[in-house]
Amino acid sequence: MAANKNSTSDAAALGWAPMKLTTWNVNGIRASLNKGLREYLFDSGADVICLQETKAMQEQVDLTFFGGYQAVWNSAEKKGYSGTCILSRVPWLSHEIGMGSADHDREGRVITTEFAEFYVVTVYTPNSQAELARLPYRLQWDDVFRAFIKRLERKKPVLVCGDLNVAHQEIDLANPKSNRMNPGFSDEERDSFTRHLDAGFLDVFREFDQSPGRYTWWTQRTPDARMKNIGWRLDYWLASGALRPALKSCTIRDDVHGSDHCPVELMIG
């Protein structure tokens, strides 16, 4: 079933104003501010901006760049590693750091903000690493995360965004055959993502766009990978099924530079 693209009356019917939200793995927030993030903050017009792989503590970042936005940070215990941040021009009702799991909350990977209509959860899913060395941990982490967002959903609908570190289907990467069983395209990781969908969450981009060649990450190990669009779709918006009537668009902004990933924008309401 395609998402509802008739936006003329949905916001009024739902009783809340439209919102623009964006997610971006910035691969180091301090470096990305000088490579395109600063301009994107000013130009995007987003109400909520979710960032992953910030690689910084809050006190290491000049917060004047975020004028007009309130911010919540979740930094890894290990300096210069992982980390997430949510910026919002819309006041939130509450926020939560992590998932409440001592085994999975040391790397700064999850932030939840509660708004009147829904939760927004940003996530930086662990990479399974070379030779799938961290795959068992990754799969356990996925299960804990799925249970966490399902608990939130008991109260109100949930939007999940971020770098989920998986290309779900062959259409989601340029070279599926040569990458079979590599980190991010193992059968186990793909099946785990399918369980998110089986739990009732929508892959919002694919609700609107079923075309190939739509990627959000390009390896820096191959200098011309982005120019040739040899990429992977690793960055997602997931939505509770109850939000389907409010989903208006989901856009991969591969024209925006500043990281090895690009932003993915969501319009809702």
Report residues per predicted region.
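N-terminal, active-site-proximal structural segment of metallo-dependent hydrolase catalytic domains
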Residues: A2-F65, A76-Y81, I97
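Active-site beta-strand/loop signature of hydrolases that rely on acidic residues for catalysis
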Residues: N25, L41-E59, V120, I149-E170, ...
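Metal-dependent phosphoesterases centered on the DNase I-like endonuclease/exonuclease/phosphatase
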Residues: V48, G68-Q70, W141-I230, L234
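Conserved beta strand-loop-helix elements of the APE1-like EEP
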Residues: K79-S94, T222-P245
